[in-house]
Amino acid sequence: MPYRLDITQGDWPGDLLHKGVEGLLAEAMVLTLATAGHEHGPHANLAFYAHDEDLVLYFVSERSTRHSHHLAEEARAAATVFLPPPAFGEQLRGLQLTGSAGEAWGRQAEAALAAYQGRYPSFAQDEETRRQYLTGGGAAALYRFQVEELTAVDEPNFGRRNYLRARVVRGW
């Protein structure tokens, strides 16, 4: 387990929370990323994502988008990942994430591409497209979101309205 979750709110064992977070990230496919910039104000967008064993989420975006401009100005970001509930008011399952995000370069780009292709095997199959993502030569780029803190709600597993908040600890 390359990262540990230190629970700051709630009363659930950390290893079970870790398992729940990993399960939810594996089951969901899209995140909502929230950014803010000095000129354009707050913004939210959707992106397909992949994640690695260090709780880093990777996504692809055009450099021309508002959120990409925001991340170039300010790395702080928030995201949500959730599964649709079966009915209104029942069985909420999701994560609220805060951390830092930005373009992935060098080894980070290699890790991003490996994670993304691991989840979406048809992504960037030709050598030229892979090279553009790894060198930053295209209109689109690989981005990384390093989760620093999370709030989890998983009513089927943790109970109704049991919000668990945790800090992500790496390199322990």
Where on the chain are the PLM-derived regions?
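Charged, gly/pro-rich active-site loop segments
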Residues: 1-15, 91-172
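Generic structural signal for secondary-structure transition and capping sites
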Residues: 29-30, 76, 121, 150
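Alpha-helix boundary recognition
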Residues: 25-26, 72-73, 135
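Short acidic (Asp/Glu) patches
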Residues: 62-65, 78-84, 120-131
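Short beta-strand segments
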Residues: 28-63, 69-71, 78-83, 92-96
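Short helix-to-loop capping/linker segments positioned immediately adjacent to catalytic or ligand/cofactor-binding
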Residues: 32-37, 86, 127-134
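Short, basic/aromatic recognition patches
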Residues: 5-32
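Short, surface-exposed beta-strand-loop junctions and turns on beta-sheet-rich folds
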Residues: 65-67, 86, 158-160
